[in-house]
Amino acid sequence: IVFTNGVFDLLHPGHVRYLQRARSLGDLLIVGLNADASVRRNKGPDRPITAEHERAELLAALECVDAVVIFEQDTPAEIVRLIQPDILVKGADWPADQIVGRDTVEARGGRVVLVPVEPGHSTSSILGRIRRQT
């Protein structure tokens, strides 16, 4: 089981390529998705742009995603404990000591894999371009 998590607001090619790489590491990819309230607490009151049920629907439609789990907490720690993935995937822009669930996964012999981030693809940059054009 491979697990990753995120907001995945305004799904873009960088997200898709990241998830494809994550899926290539195992037989099953489960994506933890921050609920709307969690996103607001983590990213501010103007986020997410796309509602959680729509973000979940888009993710679930991807061939590389086997399951989507929406979580209300600020971090996926509880879901990682429940799922017990063999591989935890995060973007390479995450400092190793800040990866939530790392201890849980490594304690049972699993591993954390950092996947390179696609340059030029981020929801923040998309939102910035939209704001500059309006």
Question: Predicted regions: what is each one?
Answer:
Residues I1-T134:
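Nucleotidyltransferase catalytic core that binds NTPs
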